[in-house]
Amino acid sequence: MKEELFKEKSRYITGVVLIVVAGLILYADNLLLFWAVLGGIYAVGFFEALRLFQVKASFSLYLILVLSWVAAYFNGHPVECALISAMVMASVIAYQKAHHSEAILPFLYPGVGFFALFGVYKDFGAVAIIWLLVVVVASDVGAFFGGKLLGKTPFTATSPNKTLEGALIGVVLASVLGSFVGMGKLSGGFLMALLFSFLIALMAVFGDLYESYLKRKVGVKDSGKILPGHGGVLDRLDSMLFGALSLHVLLYFLEIWKETAVFLGD
């Protein structure tokens, strides 16, 4: 009983600290600060992913990680750096034959998600990150309480504690709340913001499921222990990473569509 109470207390304290830190970073709205902090988090998440994919850590892995993250700061398209890092790692595997083929996987997950998260901030600003946070948090909260109150149908064997009803409630709540924040970022109004928020929330659900699948596959409860009461970095950011990639893709293609429309109009 005492252990459970301590865990819950730790969970709430850690949650408050994370919210305050995230709020301060977004308030500062400084690209270098955001890049540096997110880079440190990425390094921890990458280490956790090595465990989940059962890949042995090596100098070449972390060298590629650092160089690609530095390149992302100067590159106009950060997500490209994630894909290039995966290609470089594949080349190292082929040349050295010192790594198993699974060594490429941490550069895809969580790698692509972290680069997308940085890309969302770099290309679209702090408001887009706030939008993403609102959608992901609302999806998690809605799924948790919706599942507790109305959940009856198991969602998937990958995560047996989640229910279909909870997932649907979470997605609906995230779509509605996210649309009000997204309206400030989109010129298409409420309906476009609602559609984007729905797609982000949907991907966030599958981000959580994928993390659950990886942990279940290797027989661990949490991806790490760095966050008291929460587990590891990936336990907290799994939904965010999938959501970030979907948001970045949606906003990126929206920009292309606008530019094309202007070009054709001229």
From Swiss-Prot:
Top-level taxonomic group: Bacteria
EC numbers, comma separated: 2.7.7.41
Cellular compartment(s): Cell inner membrane
Coiled-coil ranges from the UniProt annotation: none
Membrane topology of the entry: Multi-pass membrane protein
Enzyme class name: transferase
Major place of residence: membrane
GO MF assignments: phosphatidate cytidylyltransferase activity
GO terms for cellular component: plasma membrane
Assigned protein family: Belongs to the CDS family.
Name of protein: Phosphatidate cytidylyltransferase
Organism: Helicobacter pylori (strain J99 / ATCC 700824) (Campylobacter pylori J99)
Gene expressing this chain: cdsA
